[in-house]
């Protein structure tokens, strides 16, 4: 009996030294430092950085971004955020929050008291204007985080598993384009149709973004321009579309290390990739030269058109010295099967959860049977 009591008292005293706040511009240098110095471990360890300004993508019309920081004895030790925007739920636009960017200083490994108090602080902030749903993703091989978050501990929100998600990194080299079927936005002069067509398409999926013209204009400051779109038109309407969104000007993935066996095999893997057109393993210290597929419009049953569209985006990416195209699908999405068959891609698996607190956030059981389709570029 004394053991649990002592543990609670030690946790209480330790946690009392931690202060939580909503982050502002003054916190920018320390947040970026925390992201740089605390890579995500795995077979390929990477740092997800936000240079030169963590807040560069804040202020997009229709989005509410809130970042929480934790300080222990004045030192920033943890950061996490939530982006609330319009996403489709059961065919209708709803206010949906995505919880992401959680990073705890590795020197404080095991300090789950900080995470518990951070989630409680976030819950208190959300009571004034909560989203209708919240969701998040956790890497499938991050067993430690999954074990903690799925346990339903006191003071923690409920994590309800809703599906597996697969992010693809498709190498762009050695592709032949499919023109003249494809054209870019400036040629087609789509205007509002570039918003209405993706929205009509996305209504068939869960958590897919609901776009607006205002945010599309704002994205030009973040590297998404009219020339980045490629489209297919039939009978005066858009039947397929996609955009190449290079976010490296404000969001980077840096290769920090490889598992020993993978480091040893890297030269052979890259030599084979050069011959086969498969994905190469970048050198340690390099920024991954990737861009995201955004504003994807493609019917599930149009398998040939999907492959042609992604091929055309690969050609566009290669011309810009982008080495990988990144996009993601739920594991039960037929489009994933098509791309696995047509492209040699590297896969990263994660698990999607609906997150909720008592009285805040909708439950997973309220979702109908539509396929999950959050856009990787917004996660």
What positions do the PLM features span?
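Non-catalytic interaction/regulatory modules that flank or connect domains
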Residues: 200-204, 213-247, 251, 315-322
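Active-site/acyl-donor-binding loops of N-acyltransferases
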Residues: 2-12, 138-179, 240-379
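Contiguous mid-protein beta-loop-alpha structural module that forms a pocket-lining wall or clamp
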Residues: 108, 116-230
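Long, hydrophobic/aromatic-enriched structural stretches that serve as scaffold segments
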Residues: 79-85, 96-112, 117
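A short helix-loop-beta-strand connector motif used in the catalytic cores of GNAT acetyltransferases and
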Residues: 54-72, 78, 131, 218-231, ...
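Conserved acetyl-CoA-binding loop-helix of GNAT-fold acetyltransferases
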Residues: 104, 109-125, 302-315
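Short amphipathic alpha-helix that is part of the acyltransferase structural core
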Residues: 2-55, 61-63, 67-69, 98, ...
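Conserved beta-strand in the GNAT
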Residues: 67-69, 75-85, 98, 237-248
